[in-house]
Design a protein with these regions (language model features):
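Anion-binding alpha/beta catalytic cores of soluble intermediary-metabolism enzymes, centered on
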Residues: 1-266, 271-333
Length: 333
């Protein structure tokens, strides 16, 4: 059984309700049909029901078991307006502005549904930027208790079954924080270890990646990773973690023996923490596009309720996978 099939099985054990607000995207319609067919989650779509069903007919898929909520006709609109206003009034939100946003911005509408406990999570981004998808989630849902920083990760399911957790890795931060400070990198390592345990396997082994291994290069970027590693050891001593290794020293035991003898990672990393968003974004896309890996994300970690992004280059199968992962995250909230 593949990694994502195991996640689907977990999702079915305690079925959750996930919002897919991008009802004008054919990949989303195809994914919604498959999700309800496989019993992975209950799906809410946002928009005009007639248009959505017309799209389903054109694609020859069955969306009869999908719930459609039209912001213009839902009896809960006033409740949602009040909830958005109360959540954001300190930032200048008015009831009038909240109503206008909810009638026109389906992403925000979906997030407010999650905030109101009318859905357990949301997945979007097939036709919106990461910023457009995640900004309202961060503004409305806030961080989970005890979490210092919201960050983004990818689950990378590779063909290299002798590495990672049977070929599966967690990459962070590949979608949100542009240039994390040492303190933020350490926090990302901690939340990534929790995400790994909840979604992939019991024993995260974390590499704080750099272009240097144990002082082989001198640069401010290297210093940042070294300091992040020191902070992580101090604040999160339970983590199996080391820095700063190059990628080969993180993944190949023979290279680790030569470059980083005595490292607790020892070439067996399954959680890769990138020094900045450039490295993380490029890294996951290289592994996906040239290495043939399945990439699920960017998934948010550290947020109060699960809202996850999609690459605009995603397939409908990717959406199914991210919804399954989101449903499992929702089981753990």
């Amino acid at each position: 059984m593949s990694y994502i099939d195991m996640i689907k099985e977990r999702a079915r054990l305690d079925k959750k309700t996930i919002v897919l607000p991008e009802s004008n995207d054919k990949r989303t319609l195809l994914a919604a049909a498959r999700i309800v067919e496989e019993g992975i989650a209950d799906i809410i779509m946002i928009g005009d029901e007639e248009k959505i069903m017309d799209g389903a007919g054109w694609l020859e898929v069955d969306l009869s078991k999908v719930k459609v909520v039209n912001p213009k006709t839902t009896p809960k609109l006033d409740d949602y307006v009040n909830l958005l206003y109360e959540t954001r009034k300190a930032k200048g939100m008015t009831p009038e502005k909240a109503r206008e946003i909810l009638l026109n911005d389906y992403l925000t509408f979906g997030i407010v549904m999650v905030k109101a406990n009318d859905a357990d999570g949301m997945v979007a981004g097939a036709c919106h930027s990461t910023a457009d998808t995640l900004r309202p989630a961060l503004q409305i849902l806030k961080t989970a208790p005890g979490v210092k920083l919201v960050s983004a990760f990818f689950v990378m399911d590779t063909v290299f079954k002798d590495q990672g957790e049977n070929g599966t890795f967690l990459f962070a931060d590949c979608g949100l924080n542009q240039d994390p400070t040492p303190e933020e990198l350490a926090a990302i390592a901690d939340t990534s270890s929790r995400s790994f345990k909840s979604l992939i396997g019991p024993k995260p082994v974390i590499a704080m990646l750099s272009h240097s291994t144990k002082g082989s290069a001198k640069h401010a970027l290297v210093d940042k990773v070294v300091e992040a590693t020191r902070i992580a050891h101090e604040e999160y001593p339970h983590l199996t973690l080391d820095g700063e290794p190059q990628l080969d020293a993180a993944l190949v035991p023979s290279v680790a023996k030569s470059k980083a003898p005595g490292s607790p990672v020892n070439g067996h990393a399954n959680v890769l923490i990138f020094p900045n968003l450039d490295a993380g974004n490029i890294g996951y896309k290289l592994v996906q596009r040239l290495g043939g890996a399945e990439a699920y994300g960017p998934m948010l970690q550290g947020i109060a309720k699960p809202v996850n992004d999609l690459s605009r280059g995603c397939s409908w199968q990717d959406i199914v996978g991210v919804v399954a992962l989101t449903a499992v995250q929702a089981q753990l909230v």
